[in-house]
């Protein structure tokens, strides 16, 4: 089943609560893909980075930006990334931030290497690291870093089987070193396709898959005391799922989609971190197509002076191809004088790509208002 036709959200328009929209940035769209990284990159009006991923022909080594201010797709003219999908993507906390990747898979198998982008020359480097790295694995997340460190738990081995590893691995991007700190309490069982989300000093792990078992449990570890806690959440607790997406905004964690025992999912939940309560979010039709192995992030959305005009469904106009001058250069740019002011800002969940259980690869860019 192909993507359902969602209303188009035009630049500057005010989205309505409880609705899904599609975005149609100008320029040359990236190919549909699964297992890609997805990050919001601050600076100016902000940009969304899509990195790597795969389709049935193989793994990708490309990167693309959505320029939110210009509403434009722009390829990043970088080189040297080893093709990979279902990898970890993260920005370190140093200034300026640096873009890193870890793990993932390609046609020949899983990876355990890290790479970092040199933003001055646009080249991916493979630094020498010390310590014991994790076993090669898939580990699909863009939200598992705290400060300058990436936290790795679980991941995929082969097929539906996870790596048999319940150790927490920490990669320090400053020291270029892997460590395995001692933890307390019972860790989650081995799994892959789970979401890993950093909130302050805490890591939350939800769901995942091992063989034919779909998990619906929620764990937390505070990196200040390294104690695992299984959370007895309340409310509309989501059923077991894997390969779903996640994002955090203020005091809520959001998840969308994934796959469960009965197939792909098109539901969205939010989890109140302090109250430990799940809520199933309700949306008007049409809903996005259910999907797995997609990626999601939170973006700011500027509502213009005429922003109360409703977003409408219409046929997209033919879009021009991005010129060489539109190609993304530096990762983070300086503040734009026309950057959004606080009173005109809203925030959206943005999702790109994914697939269904019939191996249809999605190429859509969909958004929904965070209330």
Swiss-Prot record:
Kelch repeats lie at residues 47-93, 98-144, 149-201, 202-251, 252-301, 348-371. The keyword Repeat applies. SMART domains: Kelch (SM00612). InterPro entries: Kelch-typ_b-propeller, Kelch_1, Rab9_kelch_effector. Coiled coil: none annotated. SUPFAM superfamilies: Kelch motif. Keywords: Kelch repeat, Repeat. It comes from the Eukaryota. Rab9 effector required for endosome to trans-Golgi network (TGN) transport. This is Rab9 effector protein with kelch motifs.
